[in-house]
Amino acid sequence: MAEEKKEYKEPRSLNNDITTHVRFQNRCDRNATLYWLNFKGNLVRYSILKKGEYIDMITYVTHPWCAKEVVTNDRLVIDKEPVYYPSEGEEETYRLVLIDIPVYSLRERCKQVIWKSFPDIDPKTLDIPRLLTKELDTKKSVSYTNYKGFRHT
């Protein structure tokens, strides 16, 4: 019997008429960039939130959101998920969803500390495993467009 291949689809917005009210609040010690994933799955930057700040959004239940740390582009979680899909809520009531730091793997955390501690050093000069050197050599970059009402506090 042939194995059925499941096609993985990148998160993206789908057309939908069901609106929902969401309050995105940054609970972590890092500044967070809030992104909406548009209909092509591309990131659209909506806001930068400092610790404790929030933004109220009227969005759709089929519109996914994600957050990244402003400087390093490290993944953050929204409501404990790497990609947040709003749920249908009570009309006019904003549902609080928190932006937090996830539990990173030891490898990922080591890379974060090295990037932060030695931002201008060539990773090949460090006494670390070669595989880690290759991973560190690739800086994280994020491609996005700004929402026309982009908010930076």
Segments and roles (model prediction):
Residues 52, 61-71:
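A short, solvent-exposed beta-strand micro-motif common in secreted/extracellular proteins
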Residues 2, 12-14, 60, 71, ...:
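Cullin-RING E3 adaptor/co-adaptor recruitment helices
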Residues 43-51:
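Short, acidic Ser/Thr/Gly-rich low-complexity loop/linker segments typical of extracellular
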Residues 1-7:
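Short, charge-rich amphipathic alpha-helices with coiled-coil/heptad character
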Residues 31-42:
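Short, surface-exposed beta-strand/strand-loop-strand elements in extracellular ectodomains
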Residues 10-13, 18-31:
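Asparagine-centered strand-capping/turn motif at beta-strand->loop junctions
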